[in-house]
């Protein structure tokens, strides 16, 4: 839901227009200074989109009329994936996803391969009207390169619910750029989400006591 919340905000320029009014610019009340548009038929690219979170984003995006692009090294969704045969969910190479999407959402885990995997080259592949959204882990994006791209207005904007350092350093340009929108890592804080975390924890403890260990790694 956090990803789609960002999509909705960007498509209606809610961040910018609310800020304008709060700053006392009521004279611009009906001025069309920020482009807004419908999200129907827009493309959302999901990096790491074949996983649980990416699939959940697709579950919301598809009924809104969006087309979903997913990057996959194998070039296909895992066998049995719920969208394996959907004509509105396409698996494409990463570069094509970046170049074609109106919204790019990062939904992959942070590891040695994904750390700083989104930087200057990747951002410059995106459309100038596109938005980058990160609700995964901050270090997946090279923030120094992102900041330079946002200063150059390479893309329309980015929404960061996660950052490399949380909160960012007080002197970070992330605070100063009007096309960068920060939220304080709230994607997991919804009441229902936190209740699920509590339920999962108690279920895992109960299973361990009964000798039925779940989610074994090794």
PLM regions and their residue ranges:
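Hydrophobic/small residue at the entry helix of a nucleotide-binding pocket
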Residues: 52-53
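Oxidoreductase and adenylate-handling cofactor-binding alpha/beta cores
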Residues: 1-19, 59-66, 200-210
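Rossmann-like adenosine-cofactor binding region
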Residues: 74-173
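Short beta-strand "acidic-cap" motif of Rossmann-like dinucleotide-binding folds
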Residues: 68-70
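Hydrophobic Val/Ile/Leu positions in short beta-strands of Rossmann-like dinucleotide-binding domains
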Residues: 46-47
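Phosphate-binding beta-alpha-beta segment of Rossmann-like dinucleotide-binding domains, i.e.
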Residues: 1-43, 217
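Short, flexible hinge/linker loops that cap or flank conserved catalytic cores
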Residues: 36-40, 62, 124-125, 174
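Adenosine-phosphate binding glycine-rich loop
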Residues: 168-169, 177-196
């Amino acid at each position: 839901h956090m990803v789609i919340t960002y999509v909705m905000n960007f498509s209606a320029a809610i961040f910018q227009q609310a800020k304008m009014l709060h700053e006392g610019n009521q004279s611009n009340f009906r001025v069309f200074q920020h482009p807004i548009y419908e999200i129907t038929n827009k493309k959302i690219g999901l990096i790491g989109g074949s996983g649980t979170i990416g699939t959940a984003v697709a579950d919301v995006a598809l009924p809104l009329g969006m087309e979903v692009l997913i990057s996959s090294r194998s070039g296909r969704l895992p066998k049995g994936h719920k969208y394996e045969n959907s004509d509105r969910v396409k698996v494409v190479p990463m570069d094509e996803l970046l170049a074609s999407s109106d919204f790019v959402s990062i939904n992959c885990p942070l590891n040695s391969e994904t750390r700083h995997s989104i930087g200057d080259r990747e951002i410059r592949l995106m459309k100038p009207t596109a938005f980058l959204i990160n609700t995964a882990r901050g270090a997946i994006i090279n923030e120094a390169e992102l900041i330079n791209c946002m200063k150059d207005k390479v893309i329309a904007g980015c929404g960061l619910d996660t950052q490399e350092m949380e909160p960012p350093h007080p002197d970070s340009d992330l605070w100063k750029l009007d096309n960068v929108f920060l939220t304080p890592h709230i994607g997991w804080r919804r009441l229902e989400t936190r209740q699920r975390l509590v339920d999962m924890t108690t279920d895992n403890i109960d299973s361990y006591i009964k000798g039925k260990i779940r989610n074994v790694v090794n």
